[in-house]
Amino acid sequence: QEYHDFILYWVHEVKTPVVASKMLINNPDLNDTETIFKQIDEELTTIDKLVMQALYFSRLDTFSKDYFIQEQNLGVVVRESVKRHSKLFIGKKMKLDLQNVDMDVRTDSKWLGFILDQILSNALKYTKSSGEVKIWCDTEASEKKVLHIKDNGRGIKEEDLPRVFEQGFTGNIGRQEKKATGMGLYLAKQMAKKLGHEICIQSESGVGTEVKIYFEQKDDYLLIAKD
């Protein structure tokens, strides 16, 4: 049923940028080629994101055959994700505050990169132009390493917070923002769990959102991975 629901969602979502692209191409009132190309490029970026979500969703059931856990420099994975979103950072004139991310953690760089992509995409999407995204790492008293991704965007209403990781849930943002799909955080949560990581969100409407990813110590991680 979960797979069926995802396919229905995916087909519905991917039609939107396809139709938008066709309208841009066939609009006789648009003579500015540069504008057309720019807007079509944005729609293609949306399609690419949806394709990647479908690809990773299809791999959830065979996760054990498609991951490789090893010591990774978190800074490398973070910077690669930031680079993939460079056009959005530049286009919206966003400030990036990147500090103390060069910690070694046990993870799969490919899957963690996808998780970070979902979080960064949301941070950029729901933060106004000239806003700020802060990314840093620290270590808690429990010796767990924590990656923080914080924005000063619109935030999430308190009543929506308990459901943000549910499949297809968009809450108040979904009613205001047509491009909200409710799949990014769901996939991020599922993948984090399979990697032995914990992901949580703190947010205040009108102030911003902070996402935290907790990385277990080596011995604790091995116990979690076995489960």
Whereabouts are the PLM-identified features?
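Short helix-loop "hinge" at the ATP-lid/N-box region of the Bergerat-fold HATPase_c
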Residues: 123-124
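Short beta-strand/loop element within the Bergerat-fold HATPase_c
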Residues: 130-143
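Acidic ATP/Mg2+-coordinating residue in the GHKL
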Residues: 151
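Short conserved segments within the C-terminal catalytic ATPase subdomain
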Residues: 87-98
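Short conserved segment of the HATPase_c
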Residues: 156-168
